[in-house]
């Protein structure tokens, strides 16, 4: 299959985007570009014709042909001698096809497009019976027969097939009792629908391909028309064309089958065969269906001037945006929201097509297809509007945009010099007079650039909204620039009057030097006398000079900024900023975790904090930076299972919230990499990470409305919160743990300067991490507390020298040479960049698995390594150890003379714990033991004496007096 791979592009070269996956000896994912389709199918067809084994599968897109997998298998005693007819008969296949055709006819929406008989044609594909011995010791076999149904002329939305259509069809199949002979031959009775699988979301083997090993490909056994009558292959595809555009014939149709049966053909082919379902006949898993909002408010239809502005702004966008799918789609969804929100959808789609046509990849039907999907969801993404277009245009073509916006605001066009400014332009020229007019012009020119509210002033820097200490320092230059743009018109205005004066016979200037005498009978221009035109020009010049005074003097500037503040101010800005859990900002853009897309930041993201590193889209698993980072973490976690778990758990750090409600406790002796690991994470997060004081989790939670400044630091999108350096005798509050690791209710806090009524409602975005050598005990834990805790052991040790340690000992004890470069700022930053990229890749795979599980109605959980479970269980045992020891050894007494001196029982406690916990050692020192025991027994904290307490009578006495002599010190 070497020649086939030469045509395809390895997915790793284009950031993982792929259309095909190899299921044979050569593993990998690949991308087929449209401009190489003809070459690919020719090479693939020739390889198939020459008998080469092929193992390529296609990745399904958002729209797929209706595909059905019928999986017949059963267990038999003795080697079977089966043929196809022993499994099913033709009537079974015909009945199943008929059920699907009827279901399509009843449930497909016919309003937009007519459903024809051709759309109902079904290709039946089969492969030979496969026999597999269960094990060598028994003479039992599994017999399998695979059948695929493929409707090549009918494309449908993938998720609707899974969520709405297949459940309905399966019900119909059970009612018809198909495959009854096969079911009756089985030991266990099953429902017919259990034989039918929906594979719309799975990779689909190309025609002629098979999996590795002895597997054979599926072949066409028959094709059924809309009446379930057999037709020839050439008749089925008669109206199609070959990959080179020539017509399908009896002689070439076999060669073209891999292309004709592709589940991911050209967008133009999908568009012609695409249908949508009516409203689902059965509401299944409503939470999984797309949210549809058919009542979106519209602002009223755009004026023709605004539509032209939309098209003009789109024309300023860079061609590179049209070549990059993510940016191309962002432009599309922006125009879609403008079009549907302002009742100019047709014009918005036209603007998108004009923009897209600049790319060599342009396919008009692809625009129609994507637009139809946006319309079906009818859900604006971050409510992108004209401001987003302006921002993108400003990034791509700032000079042209500035000239255009200025000309638009002045109500003149194409002014580049005095020659372009004629009398008509002077009459149309708008010069703002009042503060409100100037402010409106400023806001229009700087749309979505400034923001003001209860959090202060912000300016959009291209990625996030940056907080401004002094808004005047930023606005004043813009106001001055606005006035100078008008002042630059004065020479052109004067040129007009000068030209008229030179043309006027007997002209004499007035005393003012600007106008004409009242009795001037000069020539006319455009129906007006020279005097009238000069008067008009002078009035415009006066207005411009007045504007300049307001924009360039401090007092009027302050007044203007106050008006601008009122115009762009947003109430409760705190409720908007940093509230999207799916967005995380890097220094060079924003990653959208819901779409697995890295893109340019937009004003409507409302992000005010970003990480300190860029997201490097050029990284691959073979990049030296990534290899170095992985080598570092594999020394931290030499155990492969522990390494994978650490990555799977922490790839969630970028998404806001703690949806799995996990508290990670990193523990281990010193010099094992905990601090360096956390330093890498904190360094890349910057202001998105906080360090909580220990008292926040060891003390009681504050009362409602009380001052709690520590928690207020964790608002505004903070993703990472750490508590470290616990003392051995400190105890953590279980209630605080549950509050901070995510629950139904938000957290409430008040900063030092805030009034009680200004309490902040905090939706925690952070993951909570404890870092400690000795794990603190938990006060009054319940099952909900323990279910949240994951103790992650850092097993390695990093030493300054390992010369005297054998290689065997190093490997066994996980000892490594300490690399001091990991403490250097540049190394930490480099590791952070690679780590950030790698975790995003892990997150994508994990999230896709989570979504697939949700669609199938299953729960999703990652496997917890045995070492984490053991460490967590040991911690739990230690947390309950005092109470268990107390209950095992002691009992309450009514006699005041019954006393217990806790100092004497520490060694007995250690022995008891070892005996009751499989010889494990408890991580509780004597001081901590005495304190916890006295607390539990309600004894005297000064003397460590507990009254009305005695040993249980069933226990044998032991010699406490001689403990010290026997090497068991009391202190």
From Swiss-Prot:
Q: What keywords is this UniProt entry annotated with?
A: ATP-binding, Helicase, Hydrolase, Nucleotide-binding
What's its EC? 3.6.4.-
Q: Where is the SF3 helicase domain?
A: 624-807
GO MF terms here are: ATP binding; helicase activity; hydrolase activity, acting on acid anhydrides
| Gene3D superfamilies membership | P-loop containing nucleotide triphosphate hydrolases (3.40.50.300)
- Region Disordered: what ranges? 506-528
A Pfam family it matches: PriCT_2
Q: Which InterPro entries match?
A: AEP_C962R (IPR056443), Helicase_SF3_DNA-vir (IPR014015), P-loop_NTPase (IPR027417), Phage/plasmid_primase_P4_C (IPR014818), PriCT_2 (IPR014819), Viral_Helicase-Primase_Cplx (IPR051620)
Q: What is this protein called?
A: Putative helicase 184R
Q: Supply the source organism for this entry.
A: Invertebrate iridescent virus 6 (IIV-6)
């Amino acid at each position: 299959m070497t020649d086939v791979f030469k045509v395809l592009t390895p997915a790793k070269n284009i950031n993982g985007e792929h259309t095909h996956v190899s299921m044979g000896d050569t593993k990998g994912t690949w991308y087929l570009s449209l401009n190489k389709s003809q070459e690919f199918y020719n090479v693939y067809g020739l390889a198939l014709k020459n008998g080469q084994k092929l193992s390529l599968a296609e990745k399904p897109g958002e729209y797929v042909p209706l595909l059905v997998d019928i999986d017949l298998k059963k267990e038999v005693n003795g080697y079977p001698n089966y043929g196809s007819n022993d499994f099913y008969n033709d009537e079974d296949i015909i009945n199943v096809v008929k059920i699907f055709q009827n279901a399509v006819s009843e449930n497909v929406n016919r309003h937009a497009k007519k459903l024809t008989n051709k759309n109902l044609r079904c290709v039946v594909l089969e492969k030979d019976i496969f026999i597999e011995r269960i094990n060598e010791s028994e003479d039992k076999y599994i017999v399998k027969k695979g059948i695929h149904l493929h409707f090549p002329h009918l494309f449908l939305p993938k998720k609707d097939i899974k969520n709405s259509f297949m459940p309905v069809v399966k019900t119909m199949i059970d009612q018809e009792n198909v495959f009854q002979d096969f079911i009756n031959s089985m030991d266990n009775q099953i429902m017919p629908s259990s034989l039918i699988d929906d594979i719309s979301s799975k990779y689909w083997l190309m025609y002629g391909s098979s999996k590795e090993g002895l597997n054979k490909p599926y072949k066409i056994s028959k094709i059924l028309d809309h009446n379930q009558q057999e037709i020839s292959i050439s008749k089925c595809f008669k109206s199609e064309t070959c990959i080179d555009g020539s017509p399908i014939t009896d002689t070439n149709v076999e060669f073209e089958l891999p292309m004709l049966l592709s589940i991911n053909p050209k967008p133009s082919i999908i568009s012609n065969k695409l249908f949508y379902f009516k409203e689902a006949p059965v509401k299944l898993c409503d939470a999984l269906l797309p949210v549809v909002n058919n009542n979106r408010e519209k602002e009223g239809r755009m004026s023709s001037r605004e539509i032209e502005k939309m098209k003009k702004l789109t024309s300023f966008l860079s061609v590179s945006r049209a070549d990059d799918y993510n940016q191309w789609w962002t432009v599309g969804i922006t125009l879609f929201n403008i079009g549907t929100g302002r009742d100019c959808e047709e014009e918005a789609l036209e603007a998108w097509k004009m923009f897209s046509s600049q790319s060599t990849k342009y396919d008009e039907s692809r625009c129609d297809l994507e637009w139809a999907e946006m319309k079906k969801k009818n859900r604006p993404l971050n409510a992108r509007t004209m401001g987003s277009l302006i921002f993108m245009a400003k990034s791509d073509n700032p000079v042209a945009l500035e000239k255009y916006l200025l000309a638009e605001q002045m109500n003149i066009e194409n002014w580049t010099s005095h020659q372009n400014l004629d009398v008509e332009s002077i009459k149309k020229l708008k010069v703002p007079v009042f503060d409100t007019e100037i402010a409106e012009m400023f806001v229009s020119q700087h749309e979505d650039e400034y923001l003001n509210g209860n959090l202060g002033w912000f300016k959009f820097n291209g990625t996030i909204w940056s907080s401004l200490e002094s808004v005047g320092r930023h606005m004043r230059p813009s106001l001055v620039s606005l006035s100078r743009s008008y002042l630059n018109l004065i020479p052109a205005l004067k040129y007009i009057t000068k030209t008229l004066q030179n043309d006027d016979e007997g002209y004499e200037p007035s005393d003012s030097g600007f106008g004409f005498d009242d009795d001037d009978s000069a020539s006319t221009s455009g129906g007006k006398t020279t005097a009238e035109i000069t008067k008009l020009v002078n009035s415009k010049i006066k207005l411009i000079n007045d504007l300049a005074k307001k924009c360039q003097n401090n007092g009027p500037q302050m007044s203007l900024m106050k008006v601008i503040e009122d115009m762009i101010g947003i109430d409760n800005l705190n409720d908007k900023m940093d509230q999207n859990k799916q967005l995380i900002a890097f220094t060079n853009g924003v990653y959208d975790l819901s779409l697995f897309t890295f893109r340019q930041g937009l004003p409507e993201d409302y992000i005010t904090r970003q990480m300190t590193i860029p997201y490097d889209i050029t990284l691959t698993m073979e990049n030296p930076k990534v290899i170095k980072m992985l080598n570092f973490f594999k020394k931290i976690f030499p155990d492969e299972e522990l390494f994978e778990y650490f990555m799977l758990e922490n790839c969630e750090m970028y998404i806001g919230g703690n949806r799995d409600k996990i508290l990670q406790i990193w523990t281990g002796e010193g010099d094992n990499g905990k601090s360096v690991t956390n330093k890498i994470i904190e360094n890349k997060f910057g202001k998105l990470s906080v360090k909580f004081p220990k008292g926040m989790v060891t003390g009681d939670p504050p009362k409602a409305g009380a001052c709690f400044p520590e928690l207020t630091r964790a608002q505004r999108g903070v993703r990472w919160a750490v508590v470290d350096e616990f003392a051995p005798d400190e105890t953590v509050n279980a209630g605080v743990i549950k509050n901070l690791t995510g629950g139904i209710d938000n957290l409430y806090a008040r900063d030092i300067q805030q009034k009680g009524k200004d309490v902040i409602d905090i939706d925690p975005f952070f993951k909570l991490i404890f870092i400690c050598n000795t794990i603190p005990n938990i006060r009054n834990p319940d099952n909900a507390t323990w279910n949240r805790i994951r103790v992650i052991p850092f097993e390695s040790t990093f030493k300054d020298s390992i010369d005297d340690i054998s290689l065997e000992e190093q490997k066994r004890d996980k000892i490594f040479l300490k690399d001091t470069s990991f403490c250097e700022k540049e190394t930490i930053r480099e590791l952070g960049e690679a780590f950030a990229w790698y975790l995003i890749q892990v997150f994508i795979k994990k999230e896709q698995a989570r979504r697939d599980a949700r669609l199938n109605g299953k729960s999703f959980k990652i496997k917890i390594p045995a070492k984490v479970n053991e460490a967590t269980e040991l911690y739990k045992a230690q947390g309950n150890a005092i109470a268990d020891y107390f209950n095992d050894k002691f009992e309450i007494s009514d006699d005041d003379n019954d006393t217990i001196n806790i100092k004497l029982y520490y060694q007995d406690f250690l022995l008891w714990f070892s005996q009751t916990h499989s010889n494990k050692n408890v991580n509780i020192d004597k001081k901590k033991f005495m304190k916890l025991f006295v607390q539990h027994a309600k004894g005297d904290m000064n003397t460590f004496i507990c009254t009305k307490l005695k040993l249980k009578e069933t226990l044998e006495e032991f010699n406490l007096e001689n403990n010290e002599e026997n090497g068991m010190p009391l202190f």
